[in-house]
Amino acid sequence: MRDVLARIRTAAEAGADWVQIREKDLGSGALYALVRDALALVADVRRERGAATRVIVNGRLDVAVACGADGVHLGHASVPAQDAIRWCRNGGAPREFIVGVSCHSLEDARSAEAAGADYVFFGPVFDSPSKREFGAPQGAAKLREVARALRIPLIAIGGINASNARECLQTGAAGVAAIREFQDSVTDDRARNFVEAVHSGNRNEYQIAKR
């Protein structure tokens, strides 16, 4: 897990607003340990640099709450979003705990908003090997349509890189998410350049939290 933590440190030091731990093959104990280490790491970066990167856990509500993570992200294979959100809001998680939901259509996004999600991921916007199971790329025009239809923040995902991040942000998306820009084969400079490109292009005012 040292490589994963190294990527998290790179993202945090570059000023990423958050990192999402998406390790679907890890058992509960190993995932718990990784998340705790990630939380300690970003706390160190916060003390060193003042950057406040949040840690979100993909799919595992139980691990996210037990570790004290900042939130959970729910996908199509997770517990139903409506049930998870209700449980969190009824005292199962701290008040500031964030719940996000992956969506692949306007209908999905509206359902997530109605259920009480704090934000949604929408995509794939562009072609991405990790997102092909969810259909063809939807493009910037569809991203704009969905972003304008929602009252909660929308994060664009799927094939996002430093060259097209600004295009996504210009549609009204609150932010972008990327996997390939932080994989092991990517240099630290490339990861930093990606975060800088996102921050320089983002003029949208959103608060994805209750802090």
Regions found by a protein language model. Name each.
Residues 1-119, 137-141, 145-152, 161-171, ...:
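Conserved N-terminal beta1-alpha1 strand-loop-helix module at the mouth
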Residues 130-132:
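Glycine/threonine-rich flexible loop motifs
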Residues 174-178:
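Acidic, Mg2+-coordinating phosphoryl-transfer loop and its flanking beta/alpha structural elements
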